[in-house]
Swiss-Prot record:
Gene Ontology MF term list: rRNA binding; structural constituent of ribosome; tRNA binding
Keyword tags: Ribonucleoprotein, Ribosomal protein, RNA-binding, rRNA-binding, tRNA-binding
Xref: SUPFAM superfamilies: Ribosomal protein S7 (SSF47973)
Gene behind this protein: rpsG
Protein name, as recorded: Small ribosomal subunit protein uS7
Oligomeric form and interacting partners: Part of the 30S ribosomal subunit. Contacts proteins S9 and S11.
InterPro entries in the cross-refs: Ribosomal_uS7, Ribosomal_uS7_bac/org-type, Ribosomal_uS7_CS, Ribosomal_uS7_dom, Ribosomal_uS7_dom_sf
């Protein structure tokens, strides 16, 4: 590990339409091969579909979905005396949001709807209501942490 100065986090510009930093980060998560305009059209298309489907503010739905999917604890492998233990650890806030965004994207990719914007819209609506594949993933991670609670004294 380097002993030199710590490198700062890259600044993410707010997206122009809503001025929301989380939406800008989510666009970067959706983006493939640097094609940001395509990622923007997917996310904005999903927001439009959410607006049409629910009649509510898409930013509210998005932030509700994000906060529902964010994991509180996860398990990390720790080797102690020749045995590997799955140790539950609390997730840092930045990683919490990153994991939630990734899980929503992956869940949307696996859905059956025609366009990615439609898949993303439906996944976001379901996640905001506490359903969907992304929520299932979060619950699975929480279950793993709960099952391995006995090893929590092997802190990092």
């Amino acid at each position: 590990m380097s002993r030199r100065r710590v490198i700062g986090q890259a600044e993410i510009l707010r997206e122009p339409k809503f001025g929301n930093l989380d939406v800008a980060k989510f666009m970067n998560v959706v983006m493939l091969s640097g094609k940001k305009s395509i990622a923007e059209s997917i996310v904005y298309g999903a927001f439009e579909a959410i607006q049409n489907k629910t009649g509510k503010d898409p930013i509210e739905i998005f932030s509700q979905a994000l906060s529902n999917v964010k994991p509180m604890v996860e398990v990390k492998s720790r080797r102690v005396g020749g045995a590997n233990y799955q140790v539950p650890v609390e997730v840092r806030p930045q990683r919490r949001a990153a994991l939630a965004m990734r899980w929503i994207r992956e869940a949307a990719k696996k859905r059956g709807e025609k366009s990615m914007a439609q898949r993303l819209a439906n996944e976001l609506v379901e996640a905001s209501e506490g359903r969907g594949a992304a929520m299932k993933r979060r619950d699975e991670v929480h279950r793993m942490a709960e099952a391995h609670k006995a090893f929590s004294h092997f802190r990092f």
